[in-house]
Amino acid sequence: MPIVSKYSNERVEKIIQDLLDVLVKEEVTPDLALMCLGNAVTNIIAQVPESKRVAVVDNFTKALKQSV
């Protein structure tokens, strides 16, 4: 069963491209890009209610592993 997102592909792709454009503009190495994105993810997770954080992290890491 395909996953249905509440966000349009166009919106998601635009945001991803904007993020990648910043990384290219700053000429970051892959390790610096991952460090910056990892810190951003940590900041975003901190905004999730504490009672839901473990589930969010589990889902995020599962999706990340499946995408590699």
Curated annotation (Swiss-Prot):
Family annotation (InterPro entries) = UPF0352, YejL_sf
Please name one Pfam family that this protein belongs to: DUF1414
- Record's HAMAP family? UPF0352
What family name appears in the similarity comment?
Belongs to the UPF0352 family.
Q: What is this protein called?
A: UPF0352 protein CPS_2611
Q: What is the organism field in this record?
A: Colwellia psychrerythraea (strain 34H / ATCC BAA-681)
Starting at the broadest rank, the lineage of the source organism is: Bacteria, Pseudomonadati, Pseudomonadota, Gammaproteobacteria, Alteromonadales
